[in-house]
A protein has these predicted regions:
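Residue-level detector of high-confidence beta-strand sites
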Residues: 68-70, 107, 150
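Hydrophobic single-pass membrane-targeting/anchoring helices
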Residues: 3-44
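Short loop/turn segments that connect beta-strands within beta-propeller blades
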Residues: 98-101, 141-145, 180-184
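Structural motif
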Residues: 132-138, 173-181
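A structural motif specific to WD40 beta-propellers
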Residues: 103-106, 146-149, 186-187
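Repeated scaffold domains used in trafficking and secretory/extracellular systems
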Residues: 72-81, 110-122, 152-166
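Beta-strand C-termini and the immediately following turn/loop, strongest in propeller blades
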Residues: 88-91, 126-132, 170-174
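A short helix->beta-strand "capping" segment at the edge of beta-propeller domains
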Residues: 48-74, 99-103
Length: 187
């Protein structure tokens, strides 16, 4: 029985090794080029270590209300309170804030400004622009900020994104899309 488990190649010349090294180098360069230019490289995802817990339901109406904190959210059309966090969208960043303190529990940012932020079920929907309009959509789990489903499509440069909690509507001047909870287009 042979003691060497490797089978010797029939031939292995210096030129063969140089060609293999050159091919490997070209592949590494191509992969590096695409990674360098990708939006994934410019994405900063800081999920929460533990899922947020939803606040207990109020048993009675309080006699007075008091403001505890404020946050800027230029990319939401209505307040988004979901999965135990208050979701804000401003500039390039979507964040999940603790509803009691306003402290950031998680954040997700890309290299370009947000178009809009909405929600469906327990999924935060962040919409970013690319060369085809506001059609780069990232889903984030509301309680942790972990990435979920995503989609990419043609869209207008300016869109209004709204939700009834069951589906998300992205409406522009010339295009309209309706997404379900896994961000599959229904319309």
């Amino acid at each position: 029985p042979p003691t060497d488990p490797m089978i010797r190649p029939e031939r292995r010349t210096r030129a063969d090794l140089i060609a293999a090294a050159a091919i490997a180098a070209v592949v590494v360069l191509i992969v590096g080029f695409f990674w360098w230019r990708s939006s994934a490289r410019a994405t900063i995802s800081r999920p929460a270590a533990e899922p947020a817990t939803a606040a207990a339901k109020a048993e009675s109406v309080p006699s007075a209300l008091q403001q505890r904190w404020t946050a800027t959210s230029t990319r939401t059309t209505t307040p988004v309170v979901l999965g135990g966090v208050v979701v804000t969208g401003d500039g390039r960043t979507v964040a999940g804030l603790d509803p009691q303190t306003g402290e950031q529990r998680w954040s997700y940012a890309r290299d370009t400004d947000l178009c809009a932020v909405s929600y469906v079920y327990n999924l935060v929907v962040a919409v970013y622009p690319d060369t085809r309009g506001c059609g780069q959509v990232s889903g984030l789990q509301a309680s942790t900020g972990q990435r979920g489903p995503s989609r990419s499509s043609y869209a207008d440069r300016v869109v209004v994104v709204t939700s009834d909690g069951n589906a998300v509507l992205s409406a522009g001047a010339t295009r309209l899309e309706l997404w379900r909870s896994d961000l599959i287009r229904m319309l």
